[in-house]
Amino acid sequence: MSRIAKAPVDVVSGVEVSISGQEVTVKGSKGTLTRVFNDAVEVAQEENQLKALPREGFADSWAQAGTVRSILNAMVQGVSQGFEKKLTLLGVGYRAQAQGSKLNLTLGFSHPVVYEMPEGITVETPSQTEIVVKGADKQVVGQVAANIRGYRPPEPYKGKGVRYADENVRRKEAKKK
């Protein structure tokens, strides 16, 4: 049985929640997020709290309720505070430059990589080797950061590549004769 599902999600001031059937819409200062949830879970609002309640007749309703509660918490946190992922570039000539909703990356290929940001996501480059991805949707922010990292993941011998700022890359020793 899920213990996470039993904890209610606190709705902070400045955040509006509207529930219609299985569709939940959360509005805040950072934007609006809408999501349709599984039929095994009922989302209920009591004053300034949201609850994910499992429905009878579904085998995995408690597990689904825990997942829904975590997603609701991320939605409330996203529209009030937002999420961000920091990436760093390590390597000779590796550079990043934000231009509006596009990110230009020079990663040692014969051509520059241009990454178009999805709607609701902003990107900043405080320096040529740092990238900050920001947005209200936790899943999309993480996916964009993973896509950017995927162009040149850190390699284990020299550590060159695109990595998360808090990532620890395991280094290997070069083969010896």
From Swiss-Prot:
Coiled coil spans: none
Any one Gene Ontology BP term: cytoplasmic translation
Ligase recorded as keyword: no
InterPro entries (UniProt xref): Ribosomal_uL6-like (IPR000702), Ribosomal_uL6-like_a/b-dom_sf (IPR036789), Ribosomal_uL6_a/b-dom (IPR020040), Ribosomal_uL6_bac-type (IPR019906), Ribosomal_uL6_CS (IPR002358)
GO cellular component: cytosolic large ribosomal subunit
Signal peptide region: none
Entry keyword set: Ribonucleoprotein, Ribosomal protein, RNA-binding, rRNA-binding
Xref: SUPFAM superfamilies: Ribosomal protein L6
Organism domain of life: Bacteria
Disulfide bonds: none
Any GO molecular function: structural constituent of ribosome
Sequence similarity: Belongs to the universal ribosomal protein uL6 family.
Quaternary structure and interacting proteins, as annotated: Part of the 50S ribosomal subunit.
NCBIfam families (alphabetical): L6_bact
PANTHER family the record matches: 60S/50S RIBOSOMAL PROTEIN L6/L9, LARGE RIBOSOMAL SUBUNIT PROTEIN UL6M
Protein name (Swiss-Prot/TrEMBL): Large ribosomal subunit protein uL6
Organism: Alteromonas mediterranea (strain DSM 17117 / CIP 110805 / LMG 28347 / Deep ecotype)
Gene: rplF
